[in-house]
UniProtKB/Swiss-Prot annotation:
InterPro entries: EF-G-like_DII, IF2_II, IF2_N, P-loop_NTPase, Small_GTP-bd, T_Tr_GTP-bd_dom, TF_IF2_bacterial-like, TIF_IF2
SUPFAM superfamilies: Initiation factor IF2/eIF5b, domain 3, P-loop containing nucleoside triphosphate hydrolases, Translation proteins
Entries under Gene3D superfamilies matching the protein: 1.10.10.2480, P-loop containing nucleotide triphosphate hydrolases, Translation factors, Translation initiation factor IF- 2, domain 3
Basic and acidic residues bias spans: 83-99, 220-229, 288-304, 485-499
Protein name per Swiss-Prot or TrEMBL: Translation initiation factor IF-2
GO molecular function, one term: translation initiation factor activity
UniProt keyword list: Cytoplasm, GTP-binding, Initiation factor, Nucleotide-binding, Protein biosynthesis
Family stated for the protein in its record: Belongs to the TRAFAC class translation factor GTPase superfamily. Classic translation factor GTPase family. IF-2 subfamily.
Length: 1183
């Protein structure tokens, strides 16, 4: 009890010695809230539950005692027990009476349904008492207490459980009070009792045990639910027995014969035969097989399961309950291979998995012997009533109802029926006693069995209609001669066994009903109206085609589907082969391929070689290179792959970028050509004075304002000079001399008319000088050499001429055709002479253009201005550019809003050879692209759309340049560990600057650290760039650009490192230092001192060396290397260092000390101890 005065359910159940479940059930009935055994209830509620449970116990004990009293009173009338020998001779009489009662029960089916309910109990009692006196031996055996009770079925609402009581032989020998107890069978076990019994350990049965005759003779539990009550004459007999008017012996002999004769009058296909005692004894006598008497272990459990009250229409019990050999059905007791006829004791059918002893159940069902397709056996009784009526449904064990004797249905073949639809149709009468059949029925005779106890005349059957398809037998009709020795419906049993073996197959076929089921409805007209309605609905629900037809139709469909799938695969393979063959036929290998810029992606190389990209990837894989279709290949790898396919590779010349690709003058312009100013490009090595020379020409100070004193853009200027008494215009392009600006120099050369090569007199020819020479030659422009810095000490113009002559640039003074002018940009010496020479060279070139047409030219430089937007430096090469013109520069569309000259003055139009800055582009155009003016925007958009694809491909190639795969640098470090990467977001002021920086980054060593440029674009640094850097862990590098509003605050909030540079030298240097910082530091040795061992002191197991420091100093806990001669005998930590028995940190040169190492004690005099320490050193990037 709880502290609050309440009591828990489990405590109450413990006090009452009951289960918690019983107490909870009582609480629920009394509406007391108790959810589980731990629920608490008050003391008042506990008392209510106690009173309720006491009343329930009193009621139960009273009903049990009354039932027990009735049982005892009725059992007084039982006859003495027969001996085992008498029991074995009894089957003939028992079988006879079973036949009579089976015939009598059939006639009750033809009565209205009201009679069924009223007369059931009386007819059962009548038959029970009649058989009790007829078989006294069995009465005595079945007298013992009620051990094994079958599982009761689920109750139905429409019929009470007591109405449809099965009338079997075992129950006919038991009084009514013994058979029923509170509406339930005495011998019927509860579910809990059945669950407790292990199925694998049943009892062994022998003939003397009292449970043996309890086995019902006719059907398992499936048949019991279909039992029909007897006719009213049996009810009267039962009433008279209960009233004591007649004795059970009279009912057993007289009334059964009356019932048998009455039922024979109702048989549709036979003339009734007067039942005589002699005939009954002769025909009912069943042969007793004793060939293989075996007691099966599971006999009791299976035999008692059929004794279960079922009601018409009740749900069918599962078939597995009775499929353990079906040996315990009535009439098939302990006989292996027996046919299970009523009256044959100690027989048990063989256990077949899933088939459940078809021969036994076929013989044991009422009417089973005489249906179409079943054999007529001499040793089995001829059953009357329902045995030979066409259309009477019979059931296989646990399977669906089948009508086996309908006209037109093949013999030996059962058609499955939906269990829920035709439950009312199948009412096989499993009465133990059925009247004998008339021997003159038109059925074929069946041979006698060897062990038959009496001679039996051949039994004839009515000839059924010819089946539509002879199933499993050579003989197609039921009237064909039966085979001797083996029932010819075994084939049907095998078929049903296959159907019942798998429940899924049974459910799939359960709704397939033959088209002849309508005959069943017509012949079973005696059913009640609700039963006819069920038949009608089942008839309407069935498919129109017979089962055989559906089966035949299903097979071709399945085969067709298989063929279709195979055809689809074959078709796909065939099409793939055809496409491959067509592709190979169309593809023709080129004679050679030209590789631009020394790299191609895998897909581009596959397109050039006219092969599949997978072939390229496979070839690379066999060489140890794992590549994708978008990765770039270097020239060496491309040559190796191309050689496999037999195609030579030609390297695209470096000067290709400097060639003039577009002719600015068209045929329509020839009539309107006038002379135009020349475009002069100043080229040379860095710091050789190009911008200073232009300043001297322009008489301005541009070089002084440049960051770091170097040019990082193309500067376009137009000047006027006096020549031959007239003013001439010259357009100068100043290109960067740094090695990173190769693309800029190439673009400047492509649009130029004359190239001025500036060479410093004190430095001579340098790498960028050679590059400028190659660019000028590729553009096929004349070269004028300006030897600068002649005013400096140590200058040697002749040495410069000598070096240039080695590059095939021979001075006019030395007999060549190249003009060389010594100048001094600082002192403005010989500037006029240089300009005069340039004008003379351009006059020879005869430069012309048409100013009266739409402008065409080249984008020299482009950048994104924070205030103005995209700004492009345009060089007009033909025509005249005006404000408002629609311009298409590569894939970029724009409309000129304003134009500014080199001095910042706004102009409205620009003629040939005039450089201007134009505003109004939708985005920053690419430097080096040609621009053209179109008459309207529609025509310009059409051209821009076509160029967009090429531009995207170019950008992709640029982005994939960092992922280039080569044979020489194959990322072998990837196998050792993950390759370190430095992520960079690059923003610059102009497109040319981006190209220069990206080109320089490509030159950095990438063996251990890879530089990944996530984004490179001209313009200012925005918040979007900050977010990208924060998400990817990148560093933002700005070159001559600024940060947008809010970008600085976002960078501080996200912790993004933003670096801004004005000189490309510093930018590249910092990026290289950052890459080196990602490298693992290396450890190097730093020598400390040397000591010599002069004495050895043993201390326990170890030893200490007495040393003299000869060089440097010895420190405690440093690393020590012990050398004996030239051999190193030990290297490890120096653990102890003492001087005069005191621990010291270090000992300097000239002092003695004691040195001890924990891991070394094998000292010898003369050993040298080298002391050193390991320090980390930053690694450098190496190629």
């Amino acid at each position: 009890m709880t502290s609050s005065g309440k009591i828990r359910i489990y405590e109450l159940s413990k006090d009452l010695s009951l289960d918690n479940k019983d107490v909870l059930d009582a609480a629920r009935k009394l509406a007391i809230a108790a959810k589980s055994h731990s629920s608490s209830i008050s003391t008042l509620e506990a008392n209510q539950i106690k009173d309720f449970l006491k009343k329930s116990k009193t009621i139960n004990s009273t009903s049990k005692s009354s039932n027990k009293l009735d049982k005892q009173i009725l059992s007084v009338k039982k006859n003495p027990v027969k001996t085992q020998k008498d029991q074995k001779t009894e089957p003939k009489k028992k079988n006879h009476d079973q036949t009579e009662l089976s015939q009598a029960k059939l006639n009750t089916l033809l009565k209205p349904s009201q009679t069924l309910i009223k007369n059931q109990d009386s007819s059962q009692a009548n038959n029970q008492k009649a058989l009790k006196n007829k078989f006294p031996a069995q009465q005595q055996i079945t007298a013992p207490s009620k051990p094994n009770k079958p599982l009761p079925p689920n109750p139905r609402v429409e019929v009470k459980p007591t109405i449809s009581k099965p009338l079997t032989q075992a129950e006919s020998t038991i009084p009514q009070s013994e058979q029923k107890k509170d509406g339930q069978f005495i011998n019927q076990p509860k579910r809990s009792e059945l669950a407790k019994k292990p199925t694998g350990q049943p009892q062994q049965i022998n003939p003397q045990e009292p449970k043996r005759p309890l086995a019902p003779p006719s059907r398992p539990k499936i048949d019991i639910q279909d039992k029909k009550p007897l006719q009213p004459n049996n009810q009267k007999a039962k009433t008279r027995i209960n009233q004591g008017e007649i004795s059970p012996q009279k009912v057993g002999q007289g009334n059964i014969q009356k019932i048998k004769s009455q039922n024979k009058q109702n048989q549709p296909s036979r003339t009734p035969q007067p039942p005589t005692k002699g005939n009954t004894l002769e025909l009912v006598g069943a042969p007793i097989r004793r060939e293989k008497p075996v007691n099966k272990p599971h006999t009791n459990e299976v035999r008692n399961k059929p004794v279960m009250p079922s009601r018409p229409g009740a749900p069918k019990p599962p078939a597995a309950a009775n499929r353990q050999g079906l040996s315990n059905r009535p009439g098939s007791n302990n006989k292996i291979g027996g046919t299970g006829r009523p009256g044959s004791q100690n027989r048990q059918g063989p256990n077949r998995g899933g088939v459940a002893n078809r021969t036994t159940q076929g013989q044991n069902r009422p009417g089973g012997n005489n249906r179409a397709g079943a054999p007529v056996r001499s040793g089995s009784p001829n059953r009357g009533g329902i045995q030979n009526r066409p259309g009477v449904p019979t059931r296989s064990l646990g399977g669906p109802n089948r009508s086996n004797n309908r006209p037109g249905v093949p013999s030996g073949m059962r058609k499955p029926v939906a269990p829920s639809e035709l439950m009312q149709l199948q009412k096989p009468q499993a009465r133990p006693n059925a009247p004998q059949r008339k021997t003159d029925s038109p059925t074929s005779p069946r041979p006698k069995r060897e062990n038959s106890t009496g001679a039996r005349p051949p039994v004839n059957r009515p000839t059924p209609a010819a089946p539509k398809k002879p199933a499993h037998r050579p003989g197609g009709t039921a009237a064909a001669p039966r085979r001797t020795g083996r029932p010819d419906w075994d084939d049907s049993a095998k078929l049903d066994a296959l159907r019942n073996k798998s429940p899924q197959k049974q459910r799939q076929k359960v709704h397939i009903i033959g088209e002849n089921d309508d005959a069943l409805t017509a012949e079973r007209g005696g059913f009640a109206g609700e039963q006819q309605a069920v038949v009608l609905s089942a008839s309407l629900a069935r498919p129109s085609k017979p089962k055989v037809g559906k089966r035949n139709n299903g097979k071709p469909l399945t085969a067709l589907k298989k063929r279709k799938k195979e055809t689809t695969r074959q078709r796909q393979r065939r099409r793939a082969m055809e496409l491959r063959a067509a592709r190979e036929a169309k593809l023709v290998r080129p004679e050679m391929i030209v590789v631009p810029e020394d790299n191609l992606t895998v897909q581009e190389l596959a397109d050039m070689l006219s092969v599949e990209s997978s072939e390229i990837i496979k070839s690379l894989f066999f060489k140890g290179i794992t590549a994708t279709v978008t990765q770039s290949l270097d020239l060496a790898t491309i040559e190796t792959v191309a050689e496999e396919f037999g195609v030579p590779v030609l390297q695209d010349d470096v000067e290709e970028a400097a060639k003039k690709t577009v002719e600015m003058i068209e045929e329509g312009d020839l009539k309107y050509l006038i002379r135009r100013p020349p475009v002069v490009t100043v080229m040379g090595h860095v710091d050789h004075g190009k911008t200073s020379l232009l300043d001297a020409i322009r008489k301005s100070r541009v070089a002084a304002g440049e960051a770091g004193g170097i040019t990082q853009h193309i500067g376009a200027y137009q000047i006027e000079t006096e020549h031959d008494g007239s003013t001439k215009k010259l357009t100068f392009l100043d290109t960067p001399g740094h090695e990173a600006f190769t693309a800029m120099r190439a673009r400047g050369t492509r649009v130029t008319d004359v190239a001025i090569l500036v060479v410093a007199a004190d430095d001579g020819v340098r790498p960028q000088t050679l590059e400028a020479i190659s660019h000028a030659r590729a553009a096929k422009v004349p070269i004028v050499v300006a030897i600068n810095k002649i005013d400096k000490e140590g200058s040697s113009p002749d040495r410069v001429k000598q070096e240039l002559s080695e590059q095939d640039l021979l001075s006019e003074e030395w007999g060549g055709d190249v003009v060389m002018v010594p100048v001094s940009a600082i002192k403005s010496e010989n500037i006029d002479k240089l300009l005069e020479m340039v004008l003379l060279v351009t006059e020879v070139e005869d430069l012309q253009a048409n100013p009266d047409r739409l402008a065409k030219g080249t984008v020299i430089e482009a950048h994104l201005d924070k205030a103005k937007g995209p700004v492009a430096t345009l060089l007009v090469q033909n025509g005249t550019l005006k404000s408002g013109d629609v311009v298409a520069a590569g894939p970029v569309l724009g409309k000129v809003r304003a134009m500014v000259d080199e001095n910042g003055s706004r102009i409205k139009e620009a003629g040939p050879s005039c450089p201007v800055e134009a505003l109004g582009f939708s985005e920053v155009p690419t430097a080096g692209d040609e621009f053209e003016v179109y008459p309207d925007e529609k025509a310009a958009r059409a051209v821009v759309g076509e160029r967009a694809t090429d531009a995207r491909a170019a950008r992709l190639a640029q982005q994939m340049a960092s992922r280039r795969v080569s044979l020489s640098s194959m990322s072998g470090q990837a196998s050792e560990g993950e390759l370190k990467e430095l992520n960079i977001i690059l923003k610059a002021d102009a497109q040319g600057s981006l190209e220069a920086i990206l080109g320089s980054l490509e030159q950095l060593p990438k063996d251990e650290v890879q530089v990944r440029v996530l984004l490179s674009a001209p313009g200012e640094i925005t918040e979007t760039d900050i977010d990208l850097a924060a998400a990817s862990g990148a560093v933002i590098v700005g070159f001559n650009t600024s940060m947008a509003s809010g970008a600085k605050r976002a960078a501080d909030a996200n912790g993004v490192d933003v670096r801004d540079y004005e000189v490309i030298y510093k930018l590249l240097e910092d990026i290289q230092l950052a890459m080196e910082g990602l490298l693992e530091p290396e450890m190097i040795e730093e020598a400390l001192g040397v000591a010599e061992v002069r004495a050895i002191f043993s201390i326990g197991k170890s030893a200490v060396a007495g040393c003299y420091v000869t060089n440097g100093k010895i420190q405690r806990n440093c690393r020590a290397r012990v050398k004996r001669g030239k051999q190193i005998v030990f290297e490890g930590d120096l653990d102890s260092l003492k001087r005069n028995k005191d621990d010291v940190k270090d000992v300097s040169t000239g002092f003695e000390c004691g040195i001890g190492c924990d891991r070394f004690a094998n000292w010898e005099e003369g050993d040298q101890i080298e002391a050193f320490k390991l320090v980390t050193q930053r690694r450098k990037l190496t190629n």
